[in-house]
Amino acid sequence: VIRTWRFAIGFCLAALCLAACQPSPTQAQPGAVLFQDDFSRTLSGWDRHRETAYWVDYQDGTYHMRINAPNADAVSNPGLDFKDVRVQVEAAKVDGPDNNLFGIVCRYQDPGDFYFFAVSSDGYAGIGVSKSGRRHLLSHETLLPSPRILSGNATNVLRADCVGYELTLYVNGNVVNQAQAAEWDKGDVGLMVGSYEQGGVEIAFDNLSVTQP
């Protein structure tokens, strides 16, 4: 079973990064922690925004992103700048349909340009790129099912490796997708949530870490 990629004709609600001064790209020893957040502090740098179509905010020691509109997505960033990174986060559906999308962003340039590593609560996964606001997959022509993804409201540990031209998505310690891309060699990291025909998608993220590959 495959799923047609429909975000290519969707729209981005917002990219929610801070406008604060950003540091230069960091190059550290392999395994070094570049950034981490358990979302226990509401001033750790992530956006806090609420409107009818979507909202993003800290809640109960986690970071929640909710998309009320159909066929839409939102990205949130801490306002950093890295070259090669390994980003890991715990993610669980709180509300909405299993036919959703959520995951990790790397090499974020602006609201329309970044790489994303996405899974759904009904067990699909893919790696893609957003260029000038248009999204398409890099890993395959469509999102593909993976038995490594825990369905429904279960917590999944997602990991995205952005190393040189190589992009790799891990779910619960297992490689589920790989792709190559050469648009950008540095940028911000972030989190992403999206909806298809039905809105009301809410995802809780926790224990995010960014390390040197």
Locate each region found by the language model.
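C-terminal motif of bacterial Sec signal peptides marking the signal peptidase cleavage site
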Residues: 18-20
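Extracellular carbohydrate-recognition regions
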Residues: 27-50
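Extracellular beta-strand elements of beta-rich domains used
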Residues: 39, 206-210
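Short carbohydrate-recognition loop motifs
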Residues: 54-73
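Secretory/extracellular carbohydrate-interaction modules
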Residues: 67-132
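Short, aromatic/His-centered strand-loop micro-motif at the edge of beta-sheets
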Residues: 133-157
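Localized edge beta-strand/strand-to-loop motifs within extracellular or lumenal beta-rich domains
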Residues: 154-168
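Flexible glycan-contacting loops in extracellular carbohydrate-active proteins
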Residues: 179-206
